[in-house]
Amino acid sequence: MGTALHETNSSEVHVSEFILLGFPGIHEFQIWLSLPMALLYIVALGANLLILITIYLEPTLHQPMYQFLGILAAVDIGLATTSMPKILAILWFDAKTISLPECFAQIYAIHTFMCMESGVFLCMAIDRYVAICYPLQYPSIVTEAFVIKATLSMLLRNGLLTIPVPVLAAQRQYCSRNEIDHCLCSNLGVISLACDDITVNRFYQLALAWLVVGSDMILVYASYALIIRSVLRLNSTEAASKALSTCSSHLILIMFYYTAIVIVSVTHLAGRRVPLIPVLLNVMHIVIPPSLNPVVYALRTQELKVGFRKVFSLSEFVSRK
């Protein structure tokens, strides 16, 4: 801790690094969380890498629906990797210090990947909406060009709109307190340590949540509402049941993702202290969706399972050689 604070004159002390204390209230027991965290991280990396490889190598999966799944897998890997290595370092090696530039970089990466995840959810909802509600027009609407434009739009939107978050945090003055009762650099947890006014930071955080994640959430739910309405009108009971089963699985993950974001944001904005439950939710909605998304969105898709067997079967590997 001796390197964490630097005294510039007799009355002014500036922070040069933060100390991430881990999960609040259970610091002496948090080592027991390391195993499930590590397993979830391994699953997130392994399952999503398999999805990416399968979609890339199997020509029959070079379709918009599976391309969005591939983008989601890449985003999930990025989202988990921006935070989990540091969390595991804290739990296993007590590596609690993090420099200000590293902390601000983590804030930017987490916000960008979270917004990207939300954007991919929206693209996938639109893709399913067009496929179910306008099946004849689907091939001409959701094309490869549409996927490219949607992906570039998401990258541009999220990359630019999240830049002010770490920039505004870096402009604050951190005078003496440098301990964050968290296991990652949460923006609102960091700026709560500032010794100057953080009104602009809080306002932009709220505006970003509503303009990006909030609007995506509304459009996603609206898309699935229209999908369910169309499905209920189908004459085939079997087709309707299959579509509703798929939509319900998707909606469970989407509801978990967006509900966790809302709870964490409201809790942070309501006060300066970060309780245990919001911190756990904050971490879980970064780690759990990347682990579950490959199962719910991908591995339940018959075409992808067939593609996986073809790509990783020995006979197919030999024939490609």
Curated annotation (Swiss-Prot):
<feature type="transmembrane region" description="Helical; Name=2">
    <location>
        <begin position="71"/>
        <end position="91"/>
    </location>
</feature>
<dbReference type="InterPro" id="IPR000276">
    <property type="entry name" value="GPCR_Rhodpsn"/>
</dbReference>
<dbReference type="InterPro" id="IPR000725">
    <property type="entry name" value="Olfact_rcpt"/>
</dbReference>
<feature type="transmembrane region" description="Helical; Name=6">
    <location>
        <begin position="251"/>
        <end position="271"/>
    </location>
</feature>
<feature type="topological domain" description="Extracellular">
    <location>
        <begin position="92"/>
        <end position="105"/>
    </location>
</feature>
<dbReference type="Pfam" id="PF13853">
    <property type="entry name" value="7tm_4"/>
</dbReference>
<comment type="function">
    <text>Odorant receptor.</text>
</comment>
<feature type="topological domain" description="Cytoplasmic">
    <location>
        <begin position="297"/>
        <end position="321"/>
    </location>
</feature>
<keyword id="KW-1133">Transmembrane helix</keyword>
<keyword id="KW-1003">Cell membrane</keyword>
<dbReference type="GO" id="GO:0005886">
    <property type="term" value="C:plasma membrane"/>
</dbReference>
<keyword id="KW-0297">G-protein coupled receptor</keyword>
<dbReference type="GO" id="GO:0004984">
    <property type="term" value="F:olfactory receptor activity"/>
</dbReference>
<feature type="transmembrane region" description="Helical; Name=3">
    <location>
        <begin position="106"/>
        <end position="126"/>
    </location>
</feature>
<dbReference type="GO" id="GO:0007608">
    <property type="term" value="P:sensory perception of smell"/>
</dbReference>
<feature type="topological domain" description="Extracellular">
    <location>
        <begin position="272"/>
        <end position="275"/>
    </location>
</feature>
<protein>
    <recommendedName>
        <fullName>Olfactory receptor 56B34</fullName>
    </recommendedName>
</protein>
<dbReference type="GO" id="GO:0007186">
    <property type="term" value="P:G protein-coupled receptor signaling pathway"/>
</dbReference>
<dbReference type="GO" id="GO:0004930">
    <property type="term" value="F:G protein-coupled receptor activity"/>
</dbReference>
<feature type="topological domain" description="Extracellular">
    <location>
        <begin position="150"/>
        <end position="207"/>
    </location>
</feature>
<dbReference type="InterPro" id="IPR050402">
    <property type="entry name" value="OR51/52/56-like"/>
</dbReference>
<keyword id="KW-0675">Receptor</keyword>
<feature type="topological domain" description="Cytoplasmic">
    <location>
        <begin position="58"/>
        <end position="70"/>
    </location>
</feature>
<feature type="topological domain" description="Extracellular">
    <location>
        <begin position="1"/>
        <end position="36"/>
    </location>
</feature>
<feature type="transmembrane region" description="Helical; Name=7">
    <location>
        <begin position="276"/>
        <end position="296"/>
    </location>
</feature>
<keyword id="KW-0812">Transmembrane</keyword>
<dbReference type="GO" id="GO:0016020">
    <property type="term" value="C:membrane"/>
</dbReference>
<feature type="disulfide bond">
    <location>
        <begin position="103"/>
        <end position="185"/>
    </location>
</feature>
<feature type="topological domain" description="Cytoplasmic">
    <location>
        <begin position="127"/>
        <end position="128"/>
    </location>
</feature>
<keyword id="KW-0807">Transducer</keyword>
<comment type="similarity">
    <text>Belongs to the G-protein coupled receptor 1 family.</text>
</comment>
<feature type="topological domain" description="Cytoplasmic">
    <location>
        <begin position="229"/>
        <end position="250"/>
    </location>
</feature>
<keyword id="KW-1015">Disulfide bond</keyword>
<keyword id="KW-0552">Olfaction</keyword>
<feature type="transmembrane region" description="Helical; Name=5">
    <location>
        <begin position="208"/>
        <end position="228"/>
    </location>
</feature>
<feature type="transmembrane region" description="Helical; Name=4">
    <location>
        <begin position="129"/>
        <end position="149"/>
    </location>
</feature>
<feature type="transmembrane region" description="Helical; Name=1">
    <location>
        <begin position="37"/>
        <end position="57"/>
    </location>
</feature>
<keyword id="KW-0716">Sensory transduction</keyword>
<dbReference type="InterPro" id="IPR017452">
    <property type="entry name" value="GPCR_Rhodpsn_7TM"/>
</dbReference>
<keyword id="KW-0472">Membrane</keyword>
